[in-house]
Amino acid sequence: IKMESDFDWLAKPPRQKLFKIIPFKRPSSSFGYSQAVKGTWEQYKNETGNKLATRTRFKDSVDFIGWYTDKTESLLKISKKDAFRQYLAYHEGWGGYKDYKNNQKVIGLAKKVEKQSNKYKSQLQDCQKRLNKNKYIIF
């Protein structure tokens, strides 16, 4: 979510420009926290039965990403713990994943996601250590 929308619930890809100045159409239908495209969002709603899910609701976006990550693990055999390859599959789609090596920009983004993931893992481990160490302290 940090990489895709920077936690902006109304995030959309920037418009393309006609003649370098006139705002034109957007390059995709991605929208919301998860930047899910319409077709994949509809597939998520149908498969999960979550018909009222919206791309602007944080809870739904997080659930969507979990659903997508789970499907990526089963379809492409990419571990849920592999943030780099999971992000490549998320950004490029299940069909486009195989061609990611031709896209240096996406590889750079995936490296940033992997770095952020490692930071979150470290923070979580530090929290767990502190909570386990001070479990009998009353606030």
Language model features: what each stretch is:
Residues 22-26, 81-133:
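Catalytic and substrate-binding regions of cell-wall glycan-acting enzymes that process beta-1,4-linked
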Residues 33-85, 89-97, 117:
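Alpha-helical segment that forms one wall of the substrate-binding/catalytic cleft
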Residues 133-139:
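Low-complexity, Gly/Ser/Thr/Pro-rich intrinsically disordered linker/tail segments
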Residues 12-13, 53, 77, 101-102, ...:
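Short linear functional motifs in flexible/disordered or boundary regions
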Residues 29:
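Divalent-cation-assisted or electrostatically stabilized phosphate/pyrophosphate-binding catalytic cores
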Residues 19-20, 50:
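Short helix-coil transition/hinge motifs at the ends and kinks of transmembrane helices
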Residues 1-18, 65, 86-92:
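Short, functionally critical alpha-helical segments immediately adjacent to catalytic or ligand/cofactor-binding
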